[in-house]
């Protein structure tokens, strides 16, 4: 027998360890010994004395041992708190946030359960409560009344607790139970979460399974009892629920039976990390599946939001702007009221509004409105040169009263240099929000990592083509929702319910379908050319589903081929916009200026009434109300007529001319400034040193030819030296860059004209300015010299190779050909050098 002796103040603590049973005893002075039962949790007097000396408490919460007298009874109340069966149990948050867990509240609850008002236990006093929040229960110490025994009090408390718990509406979940504590519980707050299995450590001879069952069954249904074996030296009792295991552990732990002390603790359930193991053992499957789930989750969350914002982009329902349908209605109401008063006073505002368009444009506007109302697969292609007013005709005059218009500018998409910029521009055009361009770089890195780990790509990263296609797909769903917003599958017709299909509804209500306007649709581009194909396919799908009207605005005929590929069996409604005739241009300019001077005259008259010293500009009242001479002088009208000849009928140029005249410039002055501005643009874009020498020389040669004649035939250009190598490529590049426009006959280039009428005057301006012409002609001749010199070098290399052959008679014809070519190019170089000398002499003479 072994013993540990600790002398302290005349007392000795002995721990006697028998073969199977440990006995705690304290040796007192005079050789007396106090033996403590093995089932009692005991703290040595030395520890208690040190606690008292340090001023620390010896409560059960701090020491883990509950102290009670023989007149007190200890019970355990279950289900007072939520059990911490796991660290992420949401019931714990409910416990903390929504339930009153103060000490007074818990004591009041225990009192009501043990001694309710309708069945009180007289003389019963609640001495202390020790919460065990991890287990969801409370240890309560009661003072036993003198007229009751402990057994009677325990029975009455158990019965009262059972009865009181049944009164709750959620009694199945919140039912509390009370059990007398038979052992000596150890109050610990270690990180040992409850489980349904209890481990029983026997300090002494082991009990039988029957004894274990009899002792533990009262706390809950037992699924199985596992006796000790070679690998596990202790009993294990598995309960069906947490309640049974928790109550058994807190009520039985520390009990002594047949000189055997039972110590209970929860089985530490080691849960397998299924997710971690799945990722480690099945990486090639787990990572793609994870990314797929994340993608699905993102679609479920963000796609409805994006559809909502696309709808707002089209309808402007919640946008504070004049495109908002409610503000439009208010504006129309106000305009109609004002128009009524104006008509009453003899002022027709509808006539003034139509002055902004000439007669042909009004007819085309009416045709476009009629096509939208016909509702027969509306697929409209409007073609016209740059500046012909396509956008103004469609957006400002035809669709300005519609509440469901989506405008897409292809130029902003095509000119996006980076993928992130492209996606942002595309999202802005469609109203696609939210968008996360930065995710692309992240997914690319992840894709590389996954490829390095698994040997295959995850498929998470997407190209900008696929992302743009997804944007269009989401936009299609939003367009369909707008078109079918007021659709009802069943309507009441004369008391009968009539079923209506979606197709029939859309066919009968063309105004419900949104209008998609795709501007600057060229069909080909150096970068991001996929945009044209995707937009064409998307528009074709919209038209085939009959959920939208689609209008394409283009400058070239190349768009026809792209659209024909997307809709091979569809007949396009084509509208061609050309420059206005001189008469229509004159009427447009005069009507704009008459309206401006009419308003200015009214303001001047009002100012004259307010300040008599001022004089209003005279009004020629002898002319009719609609006669421009009533407001404009004949001299001004003559200057306008003279300016319109070089200005032409291009809409944007006419508008710019009108603005300049309104701001006070004379017509001749406004025209000269516009010509000078156009010539500067031509010089910077086509004739600067930064441009390819060959292209710059080709541009100047055409400028020289077109300044003399309004048009040049293509067959006259083919045989010129600068165009001889690739005539069509050179002409088409200049056309795409906006210097010239080319007409075609059955697909073959025919006539070459300036890009717009004003350019011919700009060409003439460049030719007539002697100093500028000298610089440009000198630069042109130098570029021709460089071009011919390069050709001669190439031919000389071939001659050098042929000169090494002994019998040169075999290549006499080739040698003669190369000789003639070199002679011709040399003559061209000599001619250019002579011209440069002549230009230099003329320049010097002008300076003198």
Curated annotation (Swiss-Prot):
Mitochondrial intermembrane-side segments: 306-848
Coiled coil: none
Database matches in Pfam families: RNA12, RRM_1
Keyword Transferase attributed: no
Protein localization: Mitochondrion inner membrane
A GO cellular component annotation in the UniProt record: mitochondrial inner membrane
Region of interest called Disordered, as start-end residue ranges on this chain: 603-627
Keyword entries, A-Z: Membrane, Mitochondrion, Mitochondrion inner membrane, mRNA processing, RNA-binding, Transit peptide, Transmembrane, Transmembrane helix
Domain RRM per the UniProt entry, residue ranges: 196-269
InterPro entries per record: Mt_escape_2_C, Nucleotide-bd_a/b_plait_sf, P-loop_NTPase, RBD_domain_sf, RRM_dom, Yme2_C, Yme2_RRM
Basic and acidic residues composition bias: residue spans: 613-627
Record-annotated membrane-spanning stretches: 285-305
Topology class, membrane: Single-pass membrane protein
GO molecular function: RNA binding
GO terms, biological process: mitochondrial genome maintenance; mRNA processing
Keyword Cell cycle attributed: no
Transit sequence range: 1-42
Mitochondrial matrix domain ranges by topology: 43-284
Annotated function: Plays a role in maintaining the mitochondrial genome and in controlling the mtDNA escape. Involved in the regulation of mtDNA nucleotide structure and number. May have a dispensable role in early maturation of pre-rRNA.
Entry's family note: Belongs to the YME2 family.
Stated name of the protein: Mitochondrial escape protein 2
């Amino acid at each position: 027998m072994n013993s540990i002796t600790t002398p302290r103040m005349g007392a000795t603590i002995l721990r006697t360890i028998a073969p199977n049973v440990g006995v705690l005893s304290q040796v007192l002075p005079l050789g007396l010994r106090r033996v403590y039962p093995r089932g009692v949790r005991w703290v040595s007097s030395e520890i208690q004395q040190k606690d008292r000396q340090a001023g620390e408490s010896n409560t059960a919460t701090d020491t883990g041992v509950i102290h009670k007298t023989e007149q007190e009874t200890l019970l355990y109340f279950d289900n007072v708190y939520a059990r911490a069966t796991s660290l992420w149990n949401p019931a714990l948050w409910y416990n903390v946030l929504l339930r009153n867990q103060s000490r007074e509240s818990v004591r009041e609850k225990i009192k009501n359960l043990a001694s309710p008002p309708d069945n009180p236990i007289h003389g019963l006093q609640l001495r202390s409560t020790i919460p065990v929040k991890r287990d969801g229960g409370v240890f309560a110490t009661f003072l036993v009344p003198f007229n009751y025994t402990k057994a009677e009090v325990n029975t009455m408390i158990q019965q009262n607790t059972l009865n009181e718990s049944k009164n709750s509406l959620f009694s199945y979940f919140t039912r509390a139970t009370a059990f007398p504590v038979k052992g000596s519980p150890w109050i610990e707050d270690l990180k040992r979460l409850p489980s349904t299995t209890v481990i029983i450590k026997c300090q002494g001879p082991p009990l039988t399974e029957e004894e274990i069952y009899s002792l533990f069954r009262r706390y809950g249904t037992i699924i199985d009892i596992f006796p000790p074996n070679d690998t596990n030296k202790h009993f294990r009792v598995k309960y069906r629920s947490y309640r049974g295991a928790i109550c058994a552990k807190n009520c039985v732990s520390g009990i002594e039976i047949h000189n055997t002390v039972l110590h209970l603790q929860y089985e530490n359930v080691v849960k397998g990390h299924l997710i971690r193991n799945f990722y480690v053992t099945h990486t090639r499957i787990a990572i793609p599946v994870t990314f797929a789930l994340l993608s699905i989750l993102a679609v479920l969350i963000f796609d409805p939001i994006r559809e909502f914002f696309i709808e707002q982009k089209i309808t402007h329902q919640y946008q504070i702007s004049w495109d908002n349908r409610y503000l439009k209605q208010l504006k129309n109401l106000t305009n109609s009221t004002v128009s009524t008063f104006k008509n009453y006073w003899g002022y027709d505002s509808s006539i003034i509004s139509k002055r902004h368009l000439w007669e042909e444009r009004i007819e085309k506007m009416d045709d476009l409105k009629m096509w939208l109302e016909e509702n027969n697969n509306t697929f409209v292609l409007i073609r016209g040169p740059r500046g012909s007013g396509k956008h103004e005709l469609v957006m400002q005059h035809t669709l300005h009263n519609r509440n469901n218009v989506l405008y897409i500018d292809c130029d902003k998409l095509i000119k996006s240099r980076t993928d992130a910029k492209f996606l942002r521009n595309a999202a802005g055009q469609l109203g696609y929000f939210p968008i996360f361009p930065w995710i692309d770089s992240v997914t690319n890195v992840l894709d590389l990592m996954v490829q390095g780990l698994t040997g295959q790509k995850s498929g998470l990263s997407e190209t900008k083509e696929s992302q743009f296609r997804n944007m269009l797909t989401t936009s299609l769903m939003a367009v369909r929702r707008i078109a079918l917003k007021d659709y009802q599958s069943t309507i009441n017709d004369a008391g009968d319910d009539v079923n209506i299909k979606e197709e029939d509804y859309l066919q009968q209500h063309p105004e419900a379908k949104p209008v998609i306007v795709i501007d600057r649709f060229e069909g080909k581009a150096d970068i991001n050319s996929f945009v044209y194909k995707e937009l064409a396919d998307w528009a074709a799908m919209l038209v085939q589903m009959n959920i939208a009207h689609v209008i394409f605005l283009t400058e070239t005929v190349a768009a026809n081929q792209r659209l024909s590929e997307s809709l091979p069996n569809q007949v396009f409604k084509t509208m061609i916009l050309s420059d206005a005739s001189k008469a229509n241009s004159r009427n447009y300019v005069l009507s704009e200026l008459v309206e401006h001077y009419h308003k200015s005259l009214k303001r001047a008259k009002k100012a004259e009434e307010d300040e008599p010293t001022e004089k209003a500009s005279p009004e020629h009242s002898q002319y009719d109300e609609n006669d421009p001479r009533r407001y404009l002088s004949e001299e001004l009208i003559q200057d306008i007529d003279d300016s319109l000849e070089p200005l032409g009928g291009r809409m944007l140029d006419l508008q710019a001319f009108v603005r300049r005249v309104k701001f006070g410039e004379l017509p001749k002055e406004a025209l000269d400034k516009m010509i000078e501005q156009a010539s500067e643009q031509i010089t910077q874009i086509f004739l600067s040193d930064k441009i390819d020498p060959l292209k710059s020389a080709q541009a100047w040669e055409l400028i020289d030819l077109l300044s003399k004649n309004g048009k040049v035939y293509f067959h006259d250009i083919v045989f010129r030296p600068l165009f001889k190598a690739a005539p069509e490529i050179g002409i088409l590049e200049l056309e795409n860059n906006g210097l010239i426009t080319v007409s075609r006959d059955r697909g073959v280039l025919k006539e070459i004209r300036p890009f717009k009428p004003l350019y011919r005057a700009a060409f003439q301006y460049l030719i007539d300015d002697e100093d500028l012409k000298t610089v440009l002609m000198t630069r042109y001749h130098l570029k021709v010299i460089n071009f011919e010199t390069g050709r001669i070098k190439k031919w000389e290399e071939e001659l050098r190779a042929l000169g090494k052959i002994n019998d040169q008679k075999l290549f006499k014809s080739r040698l003669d050909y190369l000789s003639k070519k070199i002679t011709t190019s040399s003559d061209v170089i000599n001619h250019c050098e002579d011209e440069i000398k002549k230009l230099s002499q003329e320049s010097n003479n002008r300076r003198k």
